[in-house]
């Protein structure tokens, strides 16, 4: 038949947060992962082989089109498993490095001063070729990475001071 089944929800969703301390230093890490789900990558569908017309599409994707399974992928956008990819990923969401100084020896108005820096959206480890494997997994269009839904996820840098009175 012409039915297509997408595993749009991960089999496993997990996260790990930990803080390591050594003397006055602390290092925190926040990671999470989704494993075992499919993403329909619409980028190549709209911008790749189907986005071209005529002979140009055959030159770009010739090896893939030699397979009879994909002989009819051209022209009008067609949803098919050709654009289905494993969306499993591991994201390092944040890493924080801090240093705490005991102030009670020097002043009566504060006990401790902590200076820290955080990097957000550190890395995404995935085999997915699209923009971001973390797509909507609920509703009618779960598991679809849409071309028009492509706001970049920025890396952030934060510096902070924490005072304990």
Question: Whereabouts are the PLM-identified features?
Answer:
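C-terminal beta-signal and terminal closure region of outer-membrane beta-barrel proteins
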Residues: 77-79, 124-165
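Long hydrophobic segments that form regular secondary structure
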Residues: 17-25
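Repeated loop/turn-to-beta-strand initiation elements of outer-membrane beta-barrel proteins
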Residues: 24-28, 104
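Outer-membrane beta-barrel domain signature
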Residues: 7, 84-86, 146-150
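Short, small-residue-biased leader/transition segments that mark boundaries at the very start
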Residues: 1-6
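Residues that define the transmembrane beta-barrel architecture of outer-membrane proteins
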Residues: 10-14, 88-93, 111, 153-157
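Extracytoplasmic gating/loop element in the C-terminal half of outer-membrane beta-barrel translocons
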Residues: 34-121
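Membrane-embedded beta-strand positions of outer-membrane beta-barrel proteins
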Residues: 29, 115-117, 161
